[in-house]
Amino acid sequence: MLTLYTFHNSICTQKVFMTLAEKDLSYDEHLINLFAAEQYDPEYLKLNPKGVVPTLVHDGRAIPESSLICEYVDEMWPNSPLIPDDAFLKSRMRQFSKLVDETIFEATRELSFSAMFREKMKNMPAEKRE
């Protein structure tokens, strides 16, 4: 059984959605409302101590971090592999994934965060926004 803890506006969640769709896997979705700070719920922090989304739970075991989730899913369900068999090509795929995680995601995180939370935060007192 697969349960995916998500937030739909999360770029990382979208990456996992695409991987699960490519593998044609069904899963239960559990929405984590970041606006309500549900990512800090003690039960969720047991699954993902960083309190970020997404997190995949498979047979009671939690896998955090979108790139790790995608690799896990590809290894667990090897039909239609997404990761190449060739060691060199696999290293190139991981290099690209690392680039996305460490550079492109970091560059877009502030913009996507600002777009998502702008309306919510502009009505907050300044001390709460900090």
Go through the PLM ranges and name each one.
Residues 1-129:
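GST-like domain detector, emphasizing the conserved glutathione-binding G-site
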